[in-house]
Curated annotation (Swiss-Prot):
InterPro entries: ARM-like, ARM-type_fold, CFA69, CFA69_ARM_dom. GO terms for cellular component: cytoplasm; non-motile cilium; sperm midpiece. This is Cilia- and flagella-associated protein 69. Residues 1-10 have a biased composition (Low complexity). The gene is CFAP69. The lineage of its organism: Eukaryota, Metazoa, Chordata, Craniata, Vertebrata. Signal peptide: none annotated. The keyword Acetylation does not apply.
Amino acid sequence: MWTEEAAATAEARESGIRNKSSSSSQIPVVGVVTEDNEAQGVFKPMDLNRVIKLLEETDKDGLEEKQLKFVKKLVQCFQNGLPLRDLAQIFKILNLCAGKIKNQPRFVESAYDIIKLCSLPFLKKKVSDEITYAEDTANSIALLGDLMKIPSSELRIQICKCIVDFYHAEPPKKHIPGYQQASSSYKIQMAEVGGLAKTMVQSITLLEHQLVEKLWVLKVLQHLSTSEVNCTIMMKAQAASGICTHLNDPDPSGQLLFRSSEILWNLLEKSSKEEVIQQLSNLECLLALKEVFTNLFMRGFSHYDRQLRNDILVITTIIAQNPEAPMIECGFTKDLILFATFNEVKSQNLLVKGLKLSNSYEDFELKKLLFNVIVILCKDLPTVQLLIDGKVILALFTYVKKPEKQKIMGWSAAQHEELQLHAIATLSSVAPLLIEEYMSCQGNARVLAFLEWCESEDPFFSHGNSFHGTGGRGNKFAQMRYSLRLLRAMVYLEDETVNTDLCEKGTIQQMIGIFKNIISKPNEKEEAIVLEIQSDILLILSGLCENHIQRKEIFGTEGVDIVLHVMKTDPRKLQSGLGYNLLLFSTLDSIWCCILGCYPSEDYFLEREGIFLLLDVLALNQKKFCNLILGIMVEFCDNPKTAAHVNAWQGKKDQTAASLLIKLWRKEEKELGVKRDKNGKIIDTKKPLFTSFQEEHKIIPLPANCPSIAVMDVSENIRAKIYAILGKLDFENLPGLSAEDFVTLCVIHRYLDFKIGEIWNEIYEEIKLEKLRPVTIDKKALEAITTASENVGKMVASLQSEIIESQARQDVQNEQKVYAKIQATHKQRELANKSWENFLARTSNAKTLKKAKRLQEKAIEASRYHKRPQNAVFHGTDIKGLNTTVPSGGVVTVESTPARLVGGPLADTDIALKKLPIRGGALQRVKAVEIVDAPKKSIPT
């Protein structure tokens, strides 16, 4: 806020005042001359206690001269700095001198000289001195603020100069042996500890008509307010209101306004903002701010004045956030509205007659600040009439149109774009409060026409240089974004006049067209803003179509297609943080408002596997979506075609929809703290649905129009929705359920019975608490209902036990089958191992081989048919030269030496081929060979 130019201007003015003050002062300057040059860097020994004792004495001849002489010696002694160890005594001497000023004016000079010493560095002999003498130092510096009560202009100015020098520390002029300078921030810290800021704030009230001293005090407070500690102290001392009420005090230099605004800024930033706003929210402060702002607005032409004007407006905007601030009563609201609109809507008001804003940076910022303050002011409903009188809607709509080639109102293209976006954003807050004015300005038509331009291919290079222009550089996304926000705000008023007008102008078709156009041209660079635009379009469509069948029919299959497109979004993107979650919420809302209740749209949604997509999202197990999706599915289940789609769905690991819903039920009960055993079985048959919340909060009598805890539980969790869906799917024919699912399903099936019993139990308990005695018949009925509810719980628990036991038996049987299969596998492996051992024995031992051969031949012979039929052809079982110990035949495969090494299993036999190619190594088969003298034989069939 404090720019270099402003600072230079202020310092120049301050310098003039300082020179003037110095010239008018009658106090002679004491020149300290040291007699011994070698001793300049060494403190002369001085008994400070003697000086104090001397100053405390009274009624002696020549005492005043002696006292003044000793004080002068003290000043000479400490001309290069003040040791921390002596600081308490030096300030006690200063206090004694100040006490004598009223009756002995000559002590003004002594006090002045000692105060001047405070501008010198504080010196420490030990490193620990800063800590050791911290309390004495803080109390000493605090004394400077108390001395502001002395009615001496010179002393007050010197005190202020001394404090300002704390923030501009200079090294000591001479090095003092044995001493070193305290840290540069030590004085500032001690000023905070001593509470100097409080006494300086209080001193403002003593300087009502002393402009020079007041400016110096403000300069001190300006420096002090750079610290959060000091700002807190100043805030508690009511500095904000005290300074603000004097903003309009006469000051030719202009420093008063500049320094005051700087202090107010620091107080708002570095102390309790709410408390400072509360201090400024009074009629006197607001009138002062109003007068200052109006004067600067009408007569401020320099860069410095315009910047100061904007700073005052920002402070005013912050105050306006307090609904208790009398902005309307002081007339400030009316003036601000006038200043915000006079460029767009011509006014004959004398305040703005002949005024014109330039395209300078300060005036451009002013325009944006005025738009912003309108948004703040419109939150106070009494402001509405002033907004109507000021024609704010009409003024803002002058920006809602495509840019023209010539400059508009002198703004550059970049400035106009930013103001355009700011104006549309302001309309989003103001227009919903002024529906009649919005409609009289043809607001819907203007916005829709502007959206057409946003969607068109007209050449346009946006600058995107502002907060509102984020994501819109080189395109029209920013304009489209804020226009859709405006439409969304108007649609969600649920005003039938506005919504009907929108539908008659083809808004539904236009929104669908914009959406389809956006998804046809993916833009990953501006993905976040594109997602926001898509979300707003879906919300607008939801607001227009809700409870209107005809509008849902207009939404139709094209609308369903864009919904399905969003539903197919990669689930991993939901965690990206770009806005996919919001888009999915908007999509689910549009399913509820635009599709449900319109049978053609419902059927088309089902045909395009919309239920599958809903269940896919539900399977992601994200709690924020579950409630809404289940509510949609409850409504969809009224369509007779839905059940088949739900039952046909399969998730990961072949999970069915019924299994998914039951899993969600178990998860919900776990979060609610419902008591179940490890198998999911009911523990308390009297309270089978009780949550931990219901257990903690005892039943209390409630009025008849207040729902009880049991009733509220129905709407506050998803159990009722799951019960409704499974009921419509038929509890008896749910596919893909495990035993655990069936145990849970027993509870779900009886949910309504349990809930009714729970409510009757609440009624019974309330009667007891109110000490009412029902008649005998009613009492018996209540007891019968309670008993029946408990019996249902016992029956369900019994059924759950049967299911658990049956599953346990089934598990045992399955385990036995698996064990039998394992045994068979082991036995087969043993037989294979034994066969392999026999094979190894035959191939490694000739006797064993011969024995096996004999056994083979014997087995073959035993298997022969002994009565041979006539004309039968005899086939030998042996092939000569075949060295195998297994039955030979055309389909026998023997795992032995590879065929490529031995020439095949028949290479050495009598029926081997007569001509074989020699390729080196073993004999190889060939595809075509000529058989020599091969007898032709008929093959028996």
